[in-house]
Amino acid sequence: MDSTQKLQVDSSLDVRGIPRATGFLKAREQLQGMLENQVLELHIDEGEPLTTIPFALRADGHEILISEPSNHGVRLLVRKRSLLT
């Protein structure tokens, strides 16, 4: 079963090739402009960004729905959540 086919992607962002802190800030900014429960498709580099960016997004209250290998990196599907609900 391919669960990605059931999820609607509302926005997409590619932060591969930039410093992980900058990538996280760009992802956070993108999510701030989205509505609750919308899904961000986020492309990140393997390695350290794969451990730090999802952790930081979860700490912000967002939900990582999918983490899978993609061309030259990793594809995440992130559901926007709010810590204050």
Identify what each model region corresponds to.
Residues 4-19:
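Acidic/glycine-enriched edge-of-secondary-structure segments
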Residues 8-10, 37-41, 73-75:
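Intrinsic-disorder/low-complexity, polar/charged segments enriched in Ser/Thr/Lys/Arg/Asp/Glu/Gln
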Residues 1-8, 77-83:
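Short, compositionally biased "basic patch" segments
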Residues 56, 60-85:
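C-terminal structural segments of small proteins and small subunits
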